[in-house]
Amino acid sequence: MKLFTGLVFCSLVLGVSSQWYSFLGEAAQGAWDMWRAYSDMREANYIGADKYFHARGNYDAAQRGPGGAWAAKVISDARENSQRVTDFFRHGNSGHGAEDSKADQAANEWGRSGKDPNHFRPAGLPSKY
């Protein structure tokens, strides 16, 4: 009986461990997807493409699974919250006002929910992106 109980316990522990391993792997890949979208946005330097890259990064990350979706939400929220903090110090045309932040979060959620990020793609953005 002790052997059976030990085997059941070990299988439960290993099952949970593999789920955490999978979640962490998805989260790391999702973080990489977010970084790639950010890098592409900086490289493209295309006016009006911000929301597209927000949606694309979140979409790509969420496609990885629950870990990727979690990473996308954490990174997106941190980015928007840090921009709100900088709003106190940067006035004028910083482009990080409350309206812009709400629009960014809407694009983030759009992508995370699995909807097509091309909805936000501006006309003329090179096909590379």
From Swiss-Prot:
<dbReference type="Pfam" id="PF00277">
    <property type="entry name" value="SAA"/>
</dbReference>
<feature type="signal peptide">
    <location>
        <begin position="1"/>
        <end position="18"/>
    </location>
</feature>
<feature type="modified residue" description="Pyrrolidone carboxylic acid">
    <location>
        <position position="19"/>
    </location>
</feature>
<keyword id="KW-0964">Secreted</keyword>
<dbReference type="InterPro" id="IPR000096">
    <property type="entry name" value="Serum_amyloid_A"/>
</dbReference>
<keyword id="KW-0011">Acute phase</keyword>
<dbReference type="GO" id="GO:0006953">
    <property type="term" value="P:acute-phase response"/>
</dbReference>
<feature type="region of interest" description="Disordered">
    <location>
        <begin position="88"/>
        <end position="129"/>
    </location>
</feature>
<keyword id="KW-0873">Pyrrolidone carboxylic acid</keyword>
<keyword id="KW-0034">Amyloid</keyword>
<protein>
    <recommendedName>
        <fullName>Serum amyloid A protein</fullName>
    </recommendedName>
</protein>
<comment type="function">
    <text>Major acute phase reactant. Apolipoprotein of the HDL complex.</text>
</comment>
<keyword id="KW-0732">Signal</keyword>
<dbReference type="InterPro" id="IPR052464">
    <property type="entry name" value="Synovial_Prolif_Regulator"/>
</dbReference>
<comment type="similarity">
    <text>Belongs to the SAA family.</text>
</comment>
<keyword id="KW-0345">HDL</keyword>
<feature type="propeptide" description="Often cleaved during amyloidogenesis">
    <location>
        <begin position="112"/>
        <end position="129"/>
    </location>
</feature>
<dbReference type="GO" id="GO:0034364">
    <property type="term" value="C:high-density lipoprotein particle"/>
</dbReference>
